[in-house]
Structure formats: C-alpha cells, structure tokens
Amino acid sequence: MKHMTLSEIADACCGIYCGDPAFLDCEVSSVAIDSRKVVKDTLFVAIKGARVDGHSFIPQVMEAGALCSLSEQDLGDVDYPYIRVSSCTEALKDLAEHYRRSLDIKVVGITGSVGKTSTKEMIASVLSEKYNVLKTEGNFNNEIGLPLTVFNIREEHEVAVLEMGISHFGDMKPLAKIARPDVCVITNIGYAHLENLGTRDGILKEKGSMTDYMNPKGSVIFNGDDDKLKSYTSRDGRTPVYFGLTSSCPFHVENIERKGLKGTYAEFVTPTSRFHAHISIPGDHMIYNALAGVAVGYALGMDNDEIARGIEKLVPIAGRNNLIEAKHYTIIDDCYNANPASMKSSLDVLAYADTRKVAILGDMGELGADELAMHREVGAYAAFKNTDVLVCIGALSKDMAEAAKETVLATEKNMKVFHFDTKEDFYQNMGQILKENDTILVKASHFMEFPEIVKKLSEEA
C-alpha cells in the first residue's frame, strides 16, 4: 500500500495518539485485522468480533513487528505506540476513505443480487488487457472486507474493481463513500436478502445508493433486461447505460452459439461497433457478465480486440460455475451461495450436459416470508429442465423436493427425487444414487457448507 504516517492515520480516524512522539512520522506498510497477517510496520486494527476480540492480540502483534495498533481500550503504560479510537470498525472505514482519496485511480464498483463475484471476475479479466488492475479477492465486499481491499491498492495500480455487498438498509452508502466509484455496475435486482430489505423495490433503493458517492462524470451501467433496473430514474443527471440480451440495450449480443458445457460464442454489439468472442464458462448468466465487461471496457477507453481477449481469458473460480473433471464424475461446483435466480441459472447450465444430469441442491437463506414458495419454485424448475436426479438436502429443501415430485407426477417427467435432512444422510446413500460419468451440479447457500460435498465427490476413489 501507499505509505501513511501515524500522524496522518490518527487525524484520518479522529483518534488520539498514545506513545512516543518520535513515531508520529513513521509510515505503516500495511493494514491488518488478522494477527497472522502482521508483518513489519503493519497497522493492526483490533476488531471486536462475535467470538474473538482483536484487543487480546495487540501485545502479540507488536512483538511480531507491527508499528502501531488501533484500540478502543486504554492500554495503559505500554512501551509501544497505539491510537485510541471510539470504534475500530468505524476507524477502519474512515481510514480507508482517506486512503482512497489519496489515490489517482479509476474505481469500478459492482453490486447486485446475483452474480457480483462472477461479474467482478469478468470485468477484471477484461480491464487487465489494458490496465494494471486490483480486484476484490474472495468475498471481501462488506464494511470490513472493502476497506482491507482498498488498502491493498498500490500506486502502480491503474484500476480497482471493487465488489460491494449489502444485506441491510444503510449498508451501501458507507461502502460507496469509501470506494468513490468512477463506474457503477448493478447486475440485477433479485430476491437475496428479502428477509432484511423487504421487497425488490427496497433492494433497488439500497443498491442504487451506490451512485450517491460516485464521480459526477462517471458511468452508470445496469442490466437492461432487469425490470427493476429498467425503471431506475437518473440521479444528478446520470442516466444509466444498459446491457442485455435484448437489442434495445446499447450493449447486447447477436448470433449466439451455445456450445453446451464448452461455453458460448456470440457477436457483441456496442454503440459504435461489433465483434466476436468466446465465453468459456457456460450459461446465459455468463453472457450478461461478459456484456457488463464490454460496457465497462468501452467506458474506460478499451478497443474491441482488448475486450475480446479479456473475455476469452476468464477462468472460473472455486464455488462459482467451476467445472471439475473428477475420476468418476463431471462436477459443476457452484456451491458458494444460492438464491432462486442463481439456482435456475445453474440448472440451465446442467441441462447442457450430455451425460446423466444430477442436481444436488440445498437450502437458500435470507428469503423472507416467501422462502418455502421459492424453494418449491426451484424444485419445479429442476423437473422442467429435464434433470435426471434431484437430491435435496436441508430442512427448507424438503419443500423443494415435494414440489419436484408433484411436477414429475403432473408432467410425467422421469426425474428421480430424493430428500435428506443432512449431508451425512446423503453420504450414506450416495453410492445407490450416483452413477459413473454423471454430471453433477452442487449448489446451496453458503451456510450449508456444500464445498464439503464437492470435495467428497472429487476425491472418491
């Protein structure tokens, strides 16, 4: 990171410096909340979590080489410097906002109900063909993760692609205030976090507030096939630019050739040109991701050849449409998270398989009052997509299985349906359900811990 002095840090987070004044002009080399990631001259931020209080690690990290710590507690007569703050979490955000303002860099902010991470990966892949890019790693997209990502920006970076996730009203504005995006991308307005945000209109309002702190001359890029985003009215004179499968969107595709699990070929149309590219990861949702990449690349001055190369170089990441050729099965690992829309997209991908199609699906969280109906909807959709075997795991997924069975009876489909309360129950019956060369989709909300299933299938002797 670009170095900051302790004096600058104390001012930025409205803290009180405690210690030898000789250290005030010393510069920190990094910021960490994890004691295991402390290196020489790190600033350690003592976050108090649900299970662990970072304050208990302050002596340890100072001995390990940290330059200073942010603390909510009076540490007394210690022989190392610290900065006293009222809230370490708020101080972390304030410091990240200050650091972002010191950087001469373009920022692309990405949010949405579905596809934030895969869209982030696509946009970063595209932009990397022209720029030195930093992107959000993993799921570091909240009030803790976003600041830590911002601190990883170095002076040589030209563009930062930052994922911004929310679950409650009021979550977005602090993130946007830190990121100060030049380009705002919203992938869609779906049903994730309905439990907290009430309605899709509530989700739109909260996610749309990302534009409140953006560059006044920046670009707003939305999915034009999403009914809620299409209804979004411009703010402060910024009218969204739309991408989508429909030709009315300035950025769209024509001549789509779907090649099953080998991906998609398409002709991409921009306001001024058109070009062809191959998307290696299957599914129409990946076409949307690529279109977002095209629109962002276009906004940041890239040419068609650069954008096409970036699209074609994208590789999947674990837990998100990652195709694994295991010894006995082909596994579609999409188990990082789930909601009704992403479940359907994944079942669409499974439908491309040439072998027997098996879906192992689990509970979806934070869907609010309609959660049972939404699980039933997914079960019926699995039958509609001609899935051969549906395995439902979890309490909520019992309704998914019941709806699937009802659909099979009503439509005379040939899908076999199983329900298990736990993963362990499924493991005991796995040998009777799965067959050699099956193509298996694995997907559920994060709390279901389905990577364990992927690991078990991958390592089966």
Please annotate each region the language model reported.
Residues M1-D94, H98, Y352-T355, A380-Y381, ...:
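N-terminal leader/targeting and accessory segments in enzymes
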Residues T119-I123, E257-F275, R320-L323:
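Acidic-glycine-rich active-site phosphate/pyrophosphate-binding loop
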Residues S69-G76, G224-K228, L245, G394-K398, ...:
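Short, polar loop motifs at secondary-structure junctions
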Residues E72, V107-V108, V185-Y191, N223, ...:
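Short beta-strands and strand-loop turn motifs
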Residues A64-L67, Y80, M214-S219, D236-T239, ...:
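A short helix->loop->beta-strand "cap" motif at the edges of active sites that frequently abuts
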Residues A22-V31, E90-K93, N141-I144, M164-F169, ...:
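Short gly/ser/thr-rich secondary-structure transition/capping motifs
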Residues M1-Y17, L43, D182, N196, ...:
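ATP-dependent carboxylate-amine ligase
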Residues E8-D11, A91-G224, K228-R238, Q432, ...:
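Phosphate-binding loop of NTP-binding sites
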